[in-house]
Each structure stands twice: as C-alpha cells, then as structure tokens.
C-alpha cells in the first residue's frame, strides 16, 4: 500500500512539473531563417508561429515562388529548433524517472 501511495505522490509531482514545463515552452522562442537571413520565422517551442520577417528586396511579383520556398524553409528551420528546445525540456523533466525508451518523453 505504501508503494501505491508513493507512486500516486510521484505521479502528482510529475503532473505539476509537466504543467510548469508547458508554461516554460510558451516562453521559449526560436528563430528559423533561410536565404541567408532574408526570411526569418519566430516560433515558440510549442510550435506557435509568432512572426515572419521578409526582407523588402524579396518582395517582387516575378520572384513569388522563390519567396514562397524561402518561407517554407524558414518555417521548417524554426520548427526543428522548437522541437529541439521541447526535447531538451522533456529530457530535463523525465531524465530521473527511469522511463523506458519509446514513450515519447525523451
């Protein structure tokens, strides 16, 4: 019975830490870039796009496809960085729990 109570307490602590981590992920912002920084995307670690910046030199009707490709690339770069930030936070949270691999927490 004591083991069960200990597990319940540990689960409650984990839930509290997860909530705190989710709040932290809202505050972490990363920048993705493409075209040598001509297009940048700012995103939270929870994958919420906060802004896109496009250098005025790229805003030409005849170069629309290039601009579209650069935006997609910058978004992908920001997403990759946001995923890394999220994984680092999750690893810090779950590192001492001894969870088996493959649960999506590490």
Curated annotation (Swiss-Prot):
Keywords: Cytoplasm, DNA-binding. GO terms for cellular component: bacterial nucleoid; cytosol. Gene3D superfamilies: Nucleoid-associated protein YbaB-like domain. SUPFAM superfamilies: YbaB-like. It is found in: Cytoplasm, Nucleoid. Belongs to the YbaB/EbfC family. This is Nucleoid-associated protein Nwi_0368. The lineage of its organism: Bacteria, Pseudomonadati, Pseudomonadota, Alphaproteobacteria, Hyphomicrobiales.
């Amino acid at each position: 019975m004591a083991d069960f109570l200990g597990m319940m307490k540990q689960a409650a602590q984990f839930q509290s830490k997860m909530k705190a981590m989710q709040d932290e992920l809202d505050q972490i912002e990363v920048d993705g870039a493409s075209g040598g920084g001509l297009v940048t995307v700012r995103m939270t670690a929870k994958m919420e796009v906060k802004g896109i910046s496009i250098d005025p030199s790229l805003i030409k009707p005849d170069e629309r496809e290039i601009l579209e490709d650069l935006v997609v690339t910058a978004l992908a770069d920001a997403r990759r960085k946001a995923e890394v930030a999220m994984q680092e936070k999750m690893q810090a949270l779950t590192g001492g729990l001894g969870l088996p691999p493959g649960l999506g927490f590490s």
